[in-house]
Each structure stands twice: as structure tokens, then as C-alpha cells.
Regions:
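Catalytic beta-strand/loop cores that center a nucleophilic Ser/Cys/Thr
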Residues: 127, 134, 231, 261-385
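Extracellular ligand-binding/catalytic regions of CAZymes and related secreted enzymes
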Residues: 21-63, 243, 341-422
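Bacterial N-terminal signal peptides that target proteins for export
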Residues: 1-8
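Alpha-helical scaffolding within the catalytic cores
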Residues: 97-102, 146-148, 357-361
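Catalytic cores of eukaryotic secretory-pathway lumenal/extracellular enzymes that build
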Residues: 183-184, 198-199, 206, 238-241, ...
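Hydrophobic targeting/anchoring helices
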Residues: 20-127
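Helical hinge/lid and interdomain linker segments adjacent to catalytic or ligand-binding clefts
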Residues: 20-23, 28-32, 62-72, 122-230, ...
């Protein structure tokens, strides 16, 4: 690794033309591959090259010191780059610094260490985050219950949760898939893992994992969750010491008054929701706006949500999380597709919504020293991803606005913002 860094520094010093001081990676409509552009930013950070994220400038562009190796790698990956002189970079920063424009520059200084919470066994659906990180060539580690309970989370900066059920109800797939081989094997594996780690029920293990994740965020970690993970995580926290699992999930009936015993103060984002007590219903709670309700008024052709616009100079965190080359994003479904506004705590910040339908799609908040971000839906380029569908081929969607939201979150932990003078 030291040899790699020294070699790269030699490139940085020796291969920099006097007239070409910076590389600009535009993130507007001129960019050929938005997704791999994030990978180039990460690639530079890995080699200790500082990256400046130009918020709201040409779609949230990246700028860094010129190196022949960086330009060559960018072009090799199909990423559009512009070689600019020192004077041009100064002019860009001057334009951004103007108090009358809604732009800002944020320094990215260190490549975040990334963990994805996912079982080692193969389940019949894809994970949008691992798909896009693999496509963008951003490295990550896979961790699951054994590693989390062993205490590895504090060694990471960023943790992703996707299609996971932290309530111990196996994704509420019992109604449709209880006789499927993959479901039978998943239940068997989950139960064996719980017993191995000293728990009598899967729900007890998952709650312990939730507490480890909570402590990770409290200590300064960055949590990003999609699909069923956001609501199942908060439901599990609210249901601490409450049995919300019916007999087919844990061998005994749920508590008759389980709903009344929920403690919403333990949740990150949600409140006042009702849990689903029907074991055959493919829903965890009323946090999600269920598909049957949505499909009365919405379909693939008219399903969109809008990113909020924030003050880049003062609200730089939500501004980073909403960088895009369009403010209108095509919707996509999941076990949890959209969050009901009346179940969202006032402390949570809404990043995107479909106002007409009253749907919140993208949420952010703080917990302790860290932050969490929740995004509804399963796969931004597969409108209704079914069990058994093949993974999305991202080479067909190199400019996906929905996948850009995921990648914004991956670079977010690398940011260091200068304090404004008052």
C-alpha cells in the first residue's frame, strides 16, 4: 500500500503539466457515467488526494489536483473529465463563494471504510447498494450477525442495511413463500445462528444487533438503510421486551397487547405507527404506504418524487445527500416503498417527497454523534423488483438519478466542512 501511494505521488508531482492544474468531474448532463464518477472520487481519496465536492455546481461536480494517473483512470472507466488550469479552478471557487448563489465547496479528505450488513447465504433478490458499489468500483466489506455481535462496527465509518427484517419475522414472506426452499433454508440458518450466539429466538438476536447498530451511530457512525430495513429497524427498537412475533415465527403467540406496549421514544425516525398483526400480510407496520393503496392512484409511468432544495452554505449535509442532475426522481417500489408523513418524528428531516400523495421517500436525522439516512424502495432502476428477478445491469443505467442518492451517502462521511465566520 505504501509503495502504491509513493508511486501515485510521483505521478502527482512529475506528470502535472503547468497549464493543467486540476481535474474537474462534471456531474451535470454532460457526464457520460455519473455512477462511476463517484468511484473516481473514492479512488482519489484512497490515494490521499483531496477531493472538493462542488455542491450545486453543475450537478454536484468533483474537483481535484491534476494527476495523469487520475485522468487516465477516469477515461478508462468511461468517466467524463475536464482538465482545467489553476485560474479556472480559482474562478469556479470564487463563483461558488458568492453569497448570492446557492452553492458551496466541501472538502473530502479520507475514503470512508464501508460495511454492508448482509447474510453470507444467497437470497433471491438483489441489493441496490452492493450493486452500485461494485459497479462504481468502491470497496466494501460484508458483515452479518456474527461480526456485529463480535463488535466490528466501530472499525467502520459507514454501514448499509437493505432488505432486512429486524423484527424476527423473516421478512413477512411466510404468507407466500413458506414452502419455498430458500425460505425454509433461511429460517433454519437464522435460527441456528441465533442459538449459536446464545439467543433462544431470532427476534432476540436481531434486537441485540439493533442495539449494536444504535451504539455505532451514537458513537459517530453513518447509517444508511433502504427498503424494509428502515421500518423494521425502528419497529424492533420500539418493541424491545415485547413479543410481536406470532407462533409461526418464534414458536409462541405474540402478546395480545403488543401494540400498546410499543415505546416510540426508542425509534430513530418513526412514531405512532401500528404493527401488522397478520402473519400473511407482506407488511411490517403502517410506516409504509402499502402497494395496494398506492396502485389505486399511481403506476410506473406517473410515479415520481421531488428532491428538496436546501441552503448549500448553511445546510450542507442535506445538500450533499440530495446532489443530482435532476430534482425529479422516478419512483421505485420495495417492501417499504414510502413513509407515511404522520408516522415521522418532527426531529427527522425530509429530503424528498411526493407531496400530492403525501409520501415521504427520503429521510435524514442525527442520533448521538452520528447520523442515519433512510430511503424507501428496493432498486432505483427496477420499478417492481420481485423475488427471483435477476440483478439489475447497471451498465444500462450509468446516469441513474436514483442510484446517485445512494452514492451521495457513501461519500458523505468523507466530508469536512469549514465553519462559517459569524
Amino acid at each position: 500500500m505504501l509503495k502504491l501511494k509513493l508511486t501515485f505521488l510521483l505521478f502527482l508531482v512529475a506528470a502535472m503539466p503547468a497549464w493543467a492544474s486540476y481535474l474537474l468531474i462534471p456531474m451535470d448532463e454532460t457526464q457520460r457515467n455519473h455512477l462511476k464518477a463517484y468511484g473516481i472520487a473514492y479512488y482519489a481519496l484512497q490515494r490521499e488526494v483531496e477531493v472538493t465536492w462542488l455542491l450545486n455546481y453543475r450537478g454536484g461536480s468533483f474537483m481535484m489536483k491534476y494527476a495523469d494517473a487520475l485522468e487516465r483512470e477516469s477515461r478508462l472507466r468511461g468517466v467524463t473529465v475536464e482538465v482545467i488550469a489553476d485560474g479556472q479552478s480559482t474562478a469556479i471557487l470564487s463563483e461558488i463563494a458568492d453569497a448570492s448563489v446557492n452553492m458551496d465547496a466541501v472538502r473530502l479528505q479520507k475514503a470512508p471504510k464501508i460495511a454492508v450488513y448482509s447474510p453470507k447465504t444467497k437470497l433471491p433478490w438483489d441489493d441496490a447498494v452492493t450493486l452500485v458499489m461494485t459497479y462504481a468500483e468502491i470497496p466494501y466489506d460484508v458483515v452479518y450477525d456474527e461480526e456485529v455481535m463480535a463488535g466490528v462496527l466501530p472499525t467502520y465509518d459507514w454501514l448499509h442495511l437493505h432488505h432486512e427484517d429486524f423484527t424476527g419475522q423473516y421478512g413477512k414472506f411466510w404468507g407466500n413463500y413458506r414452502n419455498a426452499q430458500w425460505y425454509i433454508e433461511d429460517v433454519r440458518d437464522q435460527e441456528a445462528r441465533a442459538h449459536k450466539l446464545g439467543f433462544s429466538k431470532v427476534s432476540q438476536l436481531k434486537l441485540a444487533v439493533c442495539h449494536k447498530i444504535r451504539d455505532f451511530v451514537m458513537g459517530g457512525g453513518f447509517l444508511f438503510a433502504m427498503c424494509s430495513a428502515p421500518d423494521s429497524y425502528d419497529v424492533a427498537l420500539a418493541a424491545e421486551n415485547v413479543d410481536i412475533c406470532d407462533v409461526m415465527f418464534d414458536g409462541d403467540p405474540m402478546q395480545p397487547n403488543a401494540q400498546e406496549l410499543l415505546d416510540f421514544s426508542k425509534c430513530f425516525a418513526f412514531k405512532d405507527f401500528r404493527i401488522s398483526t397478520n402473519p400473511a400480510e407482506y407488511e411490517i407496520s403502517t410506516i409504509d404506504i402499502d402497494d395496494r393503496s398506492r396502485m389505486k392512484t399511481i403506476n410506473e409511468k406517473n410515479d415520481f418524487f421531488t428532491l428538496f432544495e436546501f441552503s448549500a452554505k448553511w445546510d450542507w449535509v442535506p445538500t450533499m445527500l440530495t446532489q443530482n442532475h435532476t430534482r425529479i426522481i422516478h419512483g421505485f417500489m420495495g417492501q417499504t416503498t414510502a413513509f407515511r408523513r404522520n408516522t415521522i418524528k418532527s426531529s427527522a428531516l425530509v429530503l424528498a417527497e411526493n407531496k400530492e400523495l403525501g409520501e415521504v421517500r427520503y429521510l435524514h436525522g442525527e442520533y448521538g454523534k452520528g447520523t442515519w439516512t433512510f430511503l424507501g424502495g428496493h432498486d432505483p432502476e427496477d420499478y417492481r423488483h420481485f423475488v427471483g428477478d435477476p440483478p439489475t445491469d447497471l451498465s444500462l443505467y450509468p446516469n441513474s438519478p436514483g442510484y446517485r442518492l445512494i452514492l451521495n451517502n457513501i461519500l458523505f462521511p468523507a466530508a469536512k466542512k469549514e465553519k462559517h465566520k459569524t
